[in-house]
Amino acid sequence: TTQHILKDKLTLNLIGNASYREQRAPGSLSSEVDPVFGTVKRDFDINPYSYALRSSRTLDPDEFYTRNYTPFNIKDELSKNYMDLNVSDVKFQAELKWKITPKVEVSALGAIKYQASSTEHHIEDSSNQAQAYRSMATSIIQSNNPYLYDNPDEPNRDKYSILPQGGIYKRSDFRAKSRDFRASISYNDTFNDKHILNLFGIVEVNAIDRRATSFQGWGLQYDMGETPFYILDLFKKQLEENTQYYSLSNTRERNAAFAGTFSYSYDYRYTINGTLRYEGSNRLGRSRKARWLPTWNIAGKWSIDQESFFEPLRPAFSSLALRLSYSLTADRGPTWVNNSTATIYPLNPWRGATEIREPALSISAPENSELTYEKKHELNVGLDMGFLDDRITLSMDAYRRNNFDLIGNVVTMGLGGAVDKQGNVAEMKSQGVELSLFTRNIERKDFKWQTNFIFAWMDNEVTKLKTMTRMIDYITGTGYSMEGTPRGSLFSLKFKGLNEMGIPTFLAADGSITSTNIQFQETVNMSNLVYEGPVDPTITGSLGNIFKWKGFTLNVFMTYSFGNVVRLDPIFSNGYSDLTAMPREFANRYLNPGDERRTNVPVIASTRQNNDISNLYVAYSAYNYSDVRVAKGDFIRMKEISLSYDFPQSVSSKLRMSGLSLKFQATNPFLIYSDKKLQGQDPEFFNTGGVAVPMPKQFTLTLRVSF
């Protein structure tokens, strides 16, 4: 609400909003990268999309099969292994404006915001995950089940369950309270109808207090009145693994900034403006040297259409302006990097034996006195054009950016007591072009047609990078970066064909051809990796058309993306079960000697091959991350099609309404184009299991009534 006090000199604006959301999602654990086996796995993954994609179509959807040594049915598991999410958000804001004179205005704004979210993971008694922790029907299962407890104090005893009854209840809560205050003063004046001067000053401070808690309740009996049932050996096992069954984390973020801007325009033709900002934060640690940083921006605009020589160009040209800006901006970097002074954290050292326990303090990150903000210089040139009384408008921007002091991990000689340190270790340059074209193609009384076209091209290169990581990080997920390649580049192992047995072979780091001598945890020699391309597109944009005829409005909106690569789903393995779906690539697999000359799809490894060839799993993991398992990420997508009808006023008035409309909308209905090598895989979706699903097709019918 807005209330005017003292006529128009004093204005009070009050805003309040609140939201609450409940959601239920499939139960999910965190994914893990195995650098030895070369796999990315997630235990007890019941993601419906992943299950539908990778499960055999011969399975009866109502039957139970064996998984994790215990009965499993996807529909039953989804009903007994789920997460309840609750999110609430409340914000109140008040702004007071005082117009001291017609040219000077001061304002003060205060806001408080509270956010709270909770995630409750319910793993019920009869769920597959809970039963896996007590499955020991036979001695073979008992010795092979990884979820049973092998008591180190009783070496002659068989493994046994630490969850003899009940299920598992996991809860995590996150709360954040932020307080913001901003005071500003502005001065606006015009001299002789030619000189326009705007001055603006601002002071702002904000504080954010965050609290995160987590808890794991083992043995909660969902089928017995939700009564806990746990045994002593559960805590013994957690102590031996140094596992914390509850946690509490508080963080306090404080920020302050002082800024001033000026803008001067002469005769509506030439405009220059600048900004100077001095901000500070405690995000980088307690050191005052890393706390404050000045940033600035200077820009100019030449409105060519206001020049006298432009008049003969009308009406073909209706507007023309040239823009130029140069700036220094900064970012505080990752939230976990705060070692401008040494960071000391408490911990419980692992001692193995449960009777030996002690708290301790550890230097988690040694001091980096030179730690500072991540910075960026940007030069931007823009051109705005209008034709035929602005029926056609074109806006173009070209930019060049130099990022420096980027924060990352650097490997040192360890003289300071730590090998890995966080610091400003990287630099990157980028350039790009952005274009926006709007046209009013047809404008008649009963029919209108408008088109909006957006095009963006971007290219970047990491020019300096002092860091090291494992080979598995370069070839999985969203890739990694090397000097001379774009940020977020995808690499692959070089596939060298199938051998005479149908086993895939690759180029090893020493230059030899191998099937199993691939070290996924290698951090130094990456000469056997092939650069595939960036995981982020270099060309993006959209094309939208709006047609209006009488009361009907048709909107057709498409998006496109080109220039990136995607990793195909890692579906190959040295062993499969009857529960696994066979993808269509298997129709072209190696079957008989000599097939290695006609196909790149490896053989389904036999039991004998698994016994005779040690570490055969490495060959199939490497094949999943080889250059033959990469496709282009290019696509053109029909993003939205909608048809709406606004009923005439005569109809709505008869119904005692001020307005009545009906709208049908289809969102993400289909892909117009994508790489055939994807074979139906969504180029915008990276399947990580858990709760990840591709963008769904949505069809919405909306009736809008106003009174």
Describe each model-derived feature in a short phrase.
Residues T1, N47, Y51-A52, D60-R67, ...:
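Surface-exposed beta-strand-turn/loop segments characteristic
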Residues Q3-L10, I15-Y20, R24-L29, R67-I123, ...:
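Extracellular/periplasmic, surface-exposed regions of secreted and cell-surface proteins
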Residues E32-N73:
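Acidic, glycine-rich flexible loop segments
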Residues Q129-N151, S561-S661:
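Extracytoplasmic gating/loop element in the C-terminal half of outer-membrane beta-barrel translocons
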Residues S214, G423, R440-V535, V566, ...:
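Conserved small-residue
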Residues E532-D569:
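Glycine-rich, aromatic-lined ligand/substrate-binding cores of catalytic
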